Every structure is written in C-alpha cells, then in structure tokens.
Design a protein with these regions (language model features):
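Short alpha-helical "patches" and their helix-cap loops
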Residues: 11-20, 49-54, 126-128
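Short alpha-helices
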Residues: 1-44
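Gly/His-enriched, cation/cofactor- and phosphate-binding structural elements
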Residues: 75-173
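Short, small-residue alpha-helix embedded
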Residues: 1-4, 49, 160
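Mixed-charge interfacial surface used for oligomerization/domain docking
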Residues: 27-114
Length: 173
C-alpha cells in the first residue's frame, strides 16, 4: 500500500518491521528490537508518524531500548515453553502450555518447531479459555481451530471455550 500511495518515497522502517512480524518472516535483524520498543509506545497516528521520521540517531536509541526488552521477552518465552506438555488434539500430536496471550506467537513458534506439527497455548479467565494454535509453515493448524468453532490463519489461529471444558483440554487427549 505504501508504494502505491507514496511511489517516490522509501517504505519507512516502521512499516517494514511491522510487516516482518505480521507475516512471521523475520527478514530484518532489526525487526525484533524495533517492535519490542514499538509495543511500549502509544498506538496513535501522531506518534507513529513521528517514528516514520526518526533520524538515524533516534532510530539507534529506539532500537537499543527495544533490544534489551526483546532479550528479556525471549528469555521469558523460553522459560514458559519449558513447561509444555504433550497432547493429542483431533488425532494430531503436539505440545501445549499455559501462556499469556502476548506470548502465544513466540512460544508457539518455539514449541511447534520441536513438534513439527503444532503448539497450543491457553489462558483462562472467568470469561472462558482462550486458546492459540501456532504451527510451522509445513503444517496447517486451521482445521484444529475450526473444530472448536475458531478460526484464523494456517499457522496462527485460535478458539475460545467455556472454563468447564478446560479439564478436557488438559487431559491432552
């Protein structure tokens, strides 16, 4: 879209990095630190416009802040992933772990790389259970989500269910 509306301007780093995470390509080494800092910023057009015009010095400082946050986030994600348990979901073996929603993508990537199939991350509140499914590019987990009334994309999808069904999920069968 940027190229269409701004054909004579380079795509801002902010947009490149957001796309890099959104489609889980991770082509740019700077994406993770930049996005870790971005996640702490106000989600306003004014602030995002400022960030598209960062000087190289401002961008370096922003990235340094984000690099420290990304390192801590990755450490916490690996710690969460260590608590994973096996499960069989609709006849498919995978791994599951209790994880806050903000960790679903990274923990899911770590665990689905181990299984070769999928990872299921879940969290429960009084409103119900939120389950996120993640898979590597060689496995499509959308059918699993759809079987529970959910949806999403082939490698990132999810569903919700009542808390009363949590024991059924935790049996892993």
């Amino acid at each position: 879209a940027w190229e269409f509306f701004h054909p004579d301007e380079p795509v801002p780093a902010l947009l490149q990095y957001v796309e890099d995470r959104d489609i889980w390509k991770w082509e740019f080494a700077q994406s993770a630190p930049f996005l870790s800092a971005l996640d702490m910023e106000p989600k306003t057009f004014e602030r995002w416009k400022e960030m598209t015009r960062f000087t190289p010095e401002q961008l370096d400082a922003f990235m340094a802040r984000g690099a420290a946050m990304d390192e801590k986030f990755r450490k916490m994600a690996h710690d969460i992933a260590e608590g994973a348990q096996p499960l069989v979901f609709n006849g498919v073996a995978g791994l599951m772990v209790n994880a806050p929603g903000m960790f679903h993508s990274l923990v899911g990537d770590i665990l689905s790389a181990k299984t070769g199939t999928f990872a299921l991350m879940w969290s429960a509140t009084d409103k119900g259970v939120k389950a996120g499914l993640r898979a590597q590019r060689n496995f499509d987990c959308i059918a699993l989500a759809e079987s529970m009334g959910g949806g999403g994309h082939a490698q990132a999808c999810g569903f919700r269910m009542p808390v009363a069904r949590l024991p059924e999920l935790l049996t892993g069968v």
